Amino acid sequence: MRIGVIGTGVAGSLFVGAAKTIRGFTVQAFDRIPANNRDEAGTGLNIGPNALKAMRLHGGLSLDALRSVSLPWRRWLIALTNGTKIIDLDLLDVAEEPGLRIRWSHLYRVVRATSASSTLYGRSLEALEQDSEGRLVPVFRTADGSLVREGAFDLLVAADGRYSRLRELVDGVPRSTYPGIGTWRLLVRDAASSPIDDYGQYFCGNARLLSFRLPDNCVYIAGSFPLAGIGSVPDYTKTARAQRRFFQPEEGSVSPEVEWMLSKLDRHIDDMNWARTQEIETLHHALDGRVLLLGDAAHAMFQTLGQGATQAIEDALAAAAILRGQPQSPRAVCMGYEERRRDRIEFARRLTREATDTLLPGGDPVAGSLAKAQEPFLAKLRQLYLDVA
């Protein structure tokens, strides 16, 4: 079976790395990024303990390679911006091992090392054709503007992210749900003197700052703030003055951690990445089982619990595990994958929505956060971090 993979982010790279040695399958990946891309842009992310467990169980990537470019995620602090602590959760109370804190550029470097030899770069998907035998033929545009075809495939894998071109071609633009939250992200370099350490969230009403330390004296900061509507984030919110209003209490001072973050907000306001929190409808396969979707291309979700890249890792390794069972057709691959992953993904999406309560209008950041350190939420976290599929 000849498999083509569109996109070599987290899900695509891991799938290619795990699948390329499985007997009976030929895997070829394509990515629009240039060959030998060494982009140092991007911010940071946390990877949940469930992704690490999936790698221990199913292989596909060296955990030592990931740990060498990351820091452990052991604690989950929730406080108010004035310094009042609400909870301080030890992840080992709900997981078998800590998660990871890592820069996106470092994560991509590690995962793409497993897929680079099977990837053609500088290929941007433009269209999809079908040969006389019903196999799919992707049409790519190269850097010089020409259109190229790299042969026919029995199965195509959409691993090209939230705005997947392959998903759009086979199923249209997915419907998005917006909960009314604006976000920004920032990577601060040369931050050795920062008071920020492990994963922390700091609330002021329904606005929240999130931060954690990363390797190489970097700190990741993200802000979430109420923002109704859809479309791009309006310019009037993209000022230090407007953002400070969200995170400074009406009375009293802020904690040293928050003061440091606000000072970086003032300095780097023009360097931030802005977006609206959103999720899309889940789609595991299309075209009667000739297209399989992984990661954000299949089920982009709210980022509240940091499960985007984590579930992409689970997806990739689960899909490779299906191939090891030697399915006899592309449709069998897709059906087996959906049966394995459907309930798991829906659970992760539901829990992520539930955890977003403190960011929504009317949500109580204190009561809602306290509930996250108690049952039944702790039991759901254990299920999230322990029951990989």
What residue ranges belong to the model's regions?
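Conserved Rossmann-like nucleotide-cofactor binding loop
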Residues: A11, A35, Y163
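Conserved mid-domain beta->alpha element of the FAD-binding
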Residues: V5-A18, I22, V157-A158, W184, ...
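Conserved FAD/dinucleotide-binding core of flavoprotein oxidoreductases
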Residues: K85-D90, V94-Y108, T142-V148, R189-W274
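Histidine-centered metal-chelating micro-motifs
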Residues: Y163-S164, T183-R185, A207-L210, A298-H299
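Conserved N-terminal helical subregion
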Residues: M1-I6, G48-L187, R241-R244, L386-A389
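Conserved N-terminal glycine-rich FAD pyrophosphate-binding loop of Rossmann-like flavoproteins
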Residues: P34-A54
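C-terminal auxiliary extensions adjacent to catalytic cores
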Residues: Q374-A389
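Glycine-rich FAD pyrophosphate-binding loop
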Residues: K20-A41
